[in-house]
Amino acid sequence: QPRSRGLGDVYKRQLIDKVSGRIEYGDGLKDYEIGYLPQQTVVQKDFPATVWEVVLSGTLAGSGFKPFYGKKEKSLAIEKMRELDITDLKKKCYRNLSGGQQQRVLLARALCATSKVILLDEPVTGLDPKVTAEFYEILKKLNDKGITVIMVSHDLQSVSYATHILYLDSKDSFYGTKKEFMQSDKANVFGQMEGDEE
């Protein structure tokens, strides 16, 4: 039985659909140039594939209609696994990994699809605070390398890592820099937070 969706869920879905290419947009970015890390469901967490198979599948967007993975795709998958320090997990079954390891695998998969933009939907849901902080540090390093990171999150800690914030609720919205957000009345929703400098 489908659950009712609040206005926040509707806003989130529209944003993700727009950015991930399900709705047409005209900024010159192609849908295959966006790496997407969806919010995981119980079924996805129990996916019976190896880490290698999951990461390698991220290269499909750029491989056209080739029926097999070539050297280029395999090299890219290896590079992204090294970048996220998951090469030792290559032969392990995805469903046997911890939540943090699964998110690293999915991020490596998303990065195989793009070097421009990654879109993440609630990527730290269910992760413990230490793993969450490590995941945010990985995202910061990717952003420092020039990859645009767009993240939908209810996690307050994510504000510390943001450069710009789009805040939506049923009555109001805000878009601006982190500094502008922290100086606005919207920041009161979050209470006192650290890392409010740009």
What do these predicted ranges mean?
Residues 93-97, 101:
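Conserved ABC ATPase signature
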Residues 118-122:
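Catalytic Walker B motif of ABC-type/P-loop ATPase nucleotide-binding domains
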Residues 71-89:
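Conserved ABC ATPase "signature" region
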Residues 129-131:
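Helix N-cap at the start of a conserved alpha-helix in ABC-type nucleotide-binding domains
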Residues 153-154:
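H-loop/switch region of ABC-family ATPase nucleotide-binding domains
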Residues 1-11:
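Single conserved hydrophobic/aromatic residue that forms the stacking wall/gate
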